[in-house]
Amino acid sequence: MLHTRIRRATLGAVAALSLVPVMACGQESSADAAEPAGSAPSSSAAAHKPGEVEPYAAELKALEDEFDVRLGVYAVDTGSGREVAYRDGERFPYNSTFKALECGAVLDKHTDREMDRVVKYSEDDLVDNSPVTEKHVEDGMTLTALCDAAVRYSDNTAANLLFETVGGPKGLDKTLEGLGDHVTRMERVEPFLSRWEPGSKRDTSTPRAFAKDLRAYVLGDVLAEGDRKQLTTWLRNNTTGDGLIRAGVRQGWVVGDKTGTGSYYGARNDMAVVWRPDGRPLVLNVMVHGHTKDAELDSELIARATEVVADRLG
């Protein structure tokens, strides 16, 4: 079995994992209502002995070693408050996963009528990886259509046009600060924000911080109910997530995710809300990069990290 092989390969790895947090437990609001912003439970070691390391840490460390990467994972069961946290407070490039949060901010800022406003742009505005916007230079696109393109197709030009409606990267950064996120640093637009270099803090966040932001928009009370449903629909119908978190969850679980891919260092991300038929949703963020500029990352890594989370929280 896959997980047995991983565990056996890392019996000696646990002692080296002093940075890995432990599981936490807490109580949440009713499943019938949106969660208040900022209601996510924080990690706690109260139920564990000092220095005790969770078994899942060895499995995630094994994946780091097998794929020769740096891996960050944060997941929370929004019903029980239990967490899986591995390098969850360390910085990683967020790449295109920000587009889910950007569209949450756009929905929050604009009325339904404003979301139907057509945005005009020219060929000069087009950047790489713009499969939807490149087809609508003549007629333009509504804010709703731009969000659909940004979240479901990771369209870079759509993301840049949406940036203009929320005050640019700095404006979105300030919006996230309003959610309690004082970690994320947003500075550049596409495609430059995906060109991360080791040691840089520009356009980075932590697995925990970005997951909490996604939770606030999708499950919290930041957005009106109709806007939450719209963002959820975009995420659930994402076209770029096959082989990532979707490939690692259990049968019957429904995933709404946003992926990200960096230009260098094999940087790869997937961030999701996962709805289970027999429990409250999970919120999961996996962030990865390699150690060399030309590194290539196999998407299997994110799927297998998701399997570890599913085993622990499922």
Curated annotation (Swiss-Prot):
InterPro entries: Beta-lactam/transpept-like, Beta-lactam_cat, Beta-lactam_class-A, Beta-lactam_class-A_AS
Keywords per UniProt: Antibiotic resistance, Hydrolase, Signal
Family per record: Belongs to the class-A beta-lactamase family.
Organism: Streptomyces cacaoi
Enzyme Commission identifier(s): 3.5.2.6
Protein name: Beta-lactamase 2
Signal peptide residue numbers: 1-26
Ranges that cross the membrane: none
Catalyzed reaction equations: a beta-lactam + H2O = a substituted beta-amino acid
Residues reported in the UniProt entry to bind substrate: K258, T259, G260
Additional remark text: The class A beta-lactamase family has a specific amino-acid numbering system, sometimes called Ambler or ABL numbering and often misspelt as Amber. A multiple sequence alignment was used to derive a consensus sequence and then the consensus was numbered taking into account insertions and deletions. This allows use of identical numbers, e.g. for active site residues, despite differences in protein length. UniProt always uses natural numbering of residues, hence there appear to be differences in numbering between this entry and some papers.
GO molecular function annotations of the record: beta-lactamase activity
